[in-house]
């Protein structure tokens, strides 16, 4: 994939800020973590004094983000009420433990770093005990480096790009409580192995700003590349005028299995044009990635109430949507209603009150409490960030929407579902398969009516498919009779011309050879006459 992400910020700048706040904090300096608090001996929970945990939440105030403070804050406060009340915290933490939370605007750039450093500098070393966020890649990178340097645990439902998986040095104190983009790549790999596919076209929107779709398909590209699968890539900027015909032509010229990432309206427009080009009758398999469990990205919905609905319903029979697997339980319903109520009180009306980020930051609080409990029991303190972050890795716990599993590298396993149209007449869609990240297993659901029939979708990846324009009401599969006749006649004419050229060339070569032999014979006779003439002259002399 072109220009893979390199998250770089000046180390001199980071070191300067670190020195500004260094020395007086209780956590010690260095990425190793835990060294400063080891000598205190082991204490039991009952003997520990109440803890005041200072949490710094770094998220953007701009509500256009799915992870804005307005959206996520109710989920964090819901989790805090749970752990401070009669829930997890009362059982795990010393009596009287309280969380003091500060919310700062991270924007989606350097402001997150400046907020953290300004807060520390103002109190000369009063570092927070926990950092939640940021989400945006370019905001999270310097904060994660600083957290590592200051021995602070950092939990985020973002920082999902492939670069953050390298935890051996600068990102050693980061735990990602939402599935990273590479986990989507692992899911797509399992799906391809199930269907015995080896080639894919990656088609995505890239505005060069947040680049969510770019980072998503970067994860898919990296996993496929490691496993030897072939990918072709085509990107566009959907914030500008789109040439949908050009997008579809590039798909036709590349692969039969297409993985797309864009807004729901753009996905619908691409599918409509593909349908008009006869590409939705089984020659192609289209997949759309629904990012973050948000309908802002293509969620598989074809209906808009416009004149194209009937055509879109037909087109979407060839589209499958990949989304996060969700286990609905009573507690989740209560959580969703409380988040919705809190958000609406702040004057924000939207469709997606609860998405991956809202769930993730709620679960981050629960995970931190579990890890802190184990660290305190072992005789360490809340300032031993390295110890705390290690306790968040390689474990499974119950989150708000189901089980959450973090791998040995501090990244959440991704569980995903595949949605497809199972009733073309009604346009009904349902889950047809699930991927379980911890086991690396993809399973088709039993007793589901698959649109293509068998459990495996057969796509001829090597066949070149000819396409003709067709109206929505006509069958768009195969070639018309006149086209077949034209191909046959053209092939016969071509063969006839080749044979005529062959015989002409053969006759011409024979003629040339005969003429050459005759000339050589005449030349020999002429030479003999000249020699006889010369001898006669010498004899006369």
UniProtKB/Swiss-Prot annotation:
One of its GO terms (molecular function) is hormone binding. It is found in: Cell membrane. Coiled coil: none annotated. Chloride binds at residues 106, 135-136. GO terms for biological process: angiogenesis; blood vessel remodeling; negative regulation of cold-induced thermogenesis; osteoclast proliferation; positive regulation of nitric-oxide synthase activity; positive regulation of urine volume; regulation of blood pressure; regulation of osteoblast proliferation. Residues 27-481 are extracellular. The chain crosses the membrane at residues 482-504. It is a single-pass type I membrane protein. It is linked to Boudin-Mortier syndrome: An autosomal recessive disorder characterized by tall stature, long digits, and extra epiphyses in the hands and feet. In addition, some patients show joint hypermobility and dilation of the aortic root. Receptor for the natriuretic peptide hormones, binding with similar affinities atrial natriuretic peptide NPPA/ANP, brain natriuretic peptide NPPB/BNP, and C-type natriuretic peptide NPPC/CNP. May function as a clearance receptor for NPPA, NPPB and NPPC, regulating their local concentrations and effects. Acts as a regulator of osteoblast differentiation and bone growth by binding to its ligand osteocrin, thereby preventing binding between NPR3/NPR-C and natriuretic peptides, leading to increase cGMP production. This is Atrial natriuretic peptide receptor 3. It comes from Homo sapiens (Human).
């Amino acid at each position: 994939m072109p220009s893979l992400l390199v998250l770089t910020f000046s180390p001199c700048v980071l070191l300067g800020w670190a020195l500004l706040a260094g020395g007086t904090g209780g956590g010690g300096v260095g990425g190793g973590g835990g060294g400063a608090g080891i000598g205190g001996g082991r204490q039991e929970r009952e003997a520990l004094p109440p803890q005041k945990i200072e949490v710094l939440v770094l998220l953007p105030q701009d509500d256009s983000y799915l992870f804005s403070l307005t959206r996520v804050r109710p989920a964090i406060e819901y989790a805090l009420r749970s752990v401070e009340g009669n829930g997890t915290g009362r059982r795990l933490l010393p009596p009287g433990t309280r969380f003091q939370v500060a919310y700062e605007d991270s924007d989606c750039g350097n402001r997150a770093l400046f907020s953290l450093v300004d807060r520390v500098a103002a109190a000369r070393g009063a570092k927070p005990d926990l950092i939640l966020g940021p989400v945006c890649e370019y905001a999270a990178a310097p904060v994660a480096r600083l957290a590592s340097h200051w021995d602070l645990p950092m939990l985020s439902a973002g920082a999902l790009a492939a670069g953050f998986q390298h935890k051996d040095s600068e990102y050693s104190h980061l735990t990602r409580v939402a599935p990273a983009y590479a986990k989507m790549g692992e899911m797509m790999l399992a799906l391809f192995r199930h269907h015995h596919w080896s080639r894919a076209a990656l088609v995505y929107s890239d505005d060069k700003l947040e680049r969510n779709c770019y980072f998503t398909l970067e994860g898919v590209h990296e996993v496929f590349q490691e496993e030897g699968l072939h990918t072709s890539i085509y990107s566009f900027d959907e914030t500008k005028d789109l040439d949908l015909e050009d997008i579809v032509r590039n798909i036709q010229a590349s692969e039969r299995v297409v993985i797309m990432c864009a807004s729901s309206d753009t996905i619908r427009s691409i599918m409509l044009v593909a349908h008009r080009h006869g590409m939705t009758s089984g020659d192609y398999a289209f997949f759309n990635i629904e990012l973050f469990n948000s309908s802002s990205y293509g969620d598989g919905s074809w209906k808009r109430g416009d004149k194209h609905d009937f055509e879109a319903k037909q087109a979407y029979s060839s589209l499958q949507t990949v989304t996060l697997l969700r286990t609905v339980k009573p507690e989740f319903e209560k959580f969703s209603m409380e988040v919705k109520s809190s958000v609406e009180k702040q004057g924000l009306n939207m469709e997606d009150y609860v998405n991956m980020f809202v769930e993730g930051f709620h679960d981050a609080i629960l995970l931190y409490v579990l890890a802190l409990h184990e660290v305190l029991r072992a005789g360490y303190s809340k300032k031993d960030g390295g110890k705390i972050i290690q306790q968040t890795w390689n474990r499974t716990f119950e989150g708000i929407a189901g089980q959450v599993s973090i791998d040995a590298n501090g990244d959440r396993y991704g569980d995903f579902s595949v949605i497809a149209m199972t009733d073309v007449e009604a346009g009904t869609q349902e889950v047809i398969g699930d991927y379980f990240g911890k086991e690396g297993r993809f399973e088709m659901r039993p007793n589901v009516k698959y649109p293509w029939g068998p459990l495996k979708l057969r796509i001829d990846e090597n066949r070149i498919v000819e396409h003709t324009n067709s109206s929505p009401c006509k069958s768009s599969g195969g070639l018309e009779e006149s086209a077949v006749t034209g191909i046959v006649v053209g092939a016969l004419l071509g063969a006839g011309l080749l044979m005529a050229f062959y015989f002409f060339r053969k006759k011409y070569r024979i003629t040339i050879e005969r003429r050459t032999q005759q000339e050589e014979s005449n030349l020999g006779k002429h030479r003999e006459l000249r020699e006889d003439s010369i001898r006669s002259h010498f004899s006369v002399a």
